[in-house]
Amino acid sequence: APGILRAMPRLIFFCGHAGTGKTTLAKRALPALHRATGESFCLLDKDTLYGDYSSAVMGVLTGDPNDRDSPPYLQHLREPEYAGLMKTARENLALGVNCIVVGPLSREVRAHKLTDRAWLGVGDEVQVRIVWVHLPEDEARQRIAARGNPNDAWKLAHWDDYRTRLFMPSAQDHPELLLLDNSEPAERVFETLMTALGG
């Protein structure tokens, strides 16, 4: 309606390697942000959006529907999944809906693409925040094993190959990131997160 002022739409990324707790934090942050701002937020988790589709495709490509880390997956499905994830986010942002996007996005973070508005396809009216959730490698591996997700089977069976893709951004090289150490006490982590996000 005329005269109603709308806040700039927010695009918040929760990134980090598998097992670090990014999805759990994002799901906890969303209702807290809604309560704090009165605004609507859409949760876009790559695994939720593309998990079943990727299972069907990888079952045909490799015979393993749970494969999410092998070279065939990385070659054929990784980029289309992220492209679809970002298209969905842009569609919601254009409608004035804030988006919380959850996915590893490690290549994109390393290359600073999440601050490249041309790559994101968003204008200056969108507020972009990037949270990088991290844990020590051994703790992340323990969490992955404990959660029992079949999609982690290739990762766990080929850990030495998988771990070569792991990287930890530094505050100096990636000042755009909120680096969140999820090995800290849970309430302290969440308080740090919400303070940084303005919730």
Predicted regions and their residues:
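Walker A/P-loop
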Residues: 23
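Conserved substrate/cofactor phosphate-moiety recognition/catalytic segment
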Residues: 30-80
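Glycine-rich phosphate-binding loop used to anchor ATP phosphates in small-molecule kinases
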Residues: 73-124
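Conserved phosphate-donor/acceptor-positioning beta-strand/loop module used by diverse small-molecule
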Residues: 123-144
